[in-house]
Amino acid sequence: MQEFTNPFPIGSSSLIHCMTNEISCEMLANGILALGCKPVMADDPREVLDFTKQSQALFINLGHLSAEKEKAIRMAASYANQSSLPMVVDAVGVTTSSIRKSLVKDLLDYRPTVIKGNMSEIRSLVGLKHHGVGVDASAKDQETEDLLQVLKDWCQTYPGMSFLVTGPKDLVVSKNQVAVLENGCTELDWITGTGDLVGALTAVFLSQGKTGFEASCLAVSYLNIAAEKIVVQGMGLEEFRYQVLNQLSLLRRDENWLDTIKGEVYE
């Protein structure tokens, strides 16, 4: 498997602007802090540009969308495009909400660095048949052959963009590369916000100069490996959640953590 460059220690305490939902806000803030960066969450149109202009990466999560938040998202995305600020868009709930799907497609004009979603969300976004309900992926949507071909075509249209598709096997697709990543554990599905956290960690690695492809691979693998280290039979939900955040701060001290990434990268 391709050797990625270790992003640690974080070279600068970057400011990561997360426009996210209220449910996962605290987890994302703590996750970003655990990696050595600083979070800020501002989604009021009156101040959103003040914070975006100070940030080194922008993470947009469509959970809990409102008319005011949509206005702020469009303002921040436009600035990110004009200033070449790395941007991650998490397409939460596009399987169900036509408003969210339309917004994500509009955001493509602002050239996001990474589009993230689960298997059902990304299939819905690119026009493939899907069975997603609410914000959850369906087990029926795990076929990847048709999805990979469509994503490759989209990356030709948007050559600077990568897709991060989470599932039992995580996919990362760019114009020239495909990664199939196999770390992780089912316990991550026990607690809300872990998918959102992957997007925030992707923004962290983008702030350190990583490409969209490499930042996506590093982010999803980092969280999955951290979770693998703490799986203990009989552990309760709250303890597991606490230990996930705890391990995020500890794993970066392991100079060999990249060696535990499972999967393949194809040109």
Curated annotation (Swiss-Prot):
Species annotation: Streptococcus pneumoniae (strain 70585)
Binding site for substrate: M41, G193
Protein name: Hydroxyethylthiazole kinase 2
Catalyzed chemical reaction(s): 5-(2-hydroxyethyl)-4-methylthiazole + ATP = 4-methyl-5-(2-phosphooxyethyl)-thiazole + ADP + H(+)
Protein residues bound to ATP: K116, T166
Family: Belongs to the Thz kinase family.
Coiled-coil region: none
Broadest EC class assigned to this enzyme: transferase
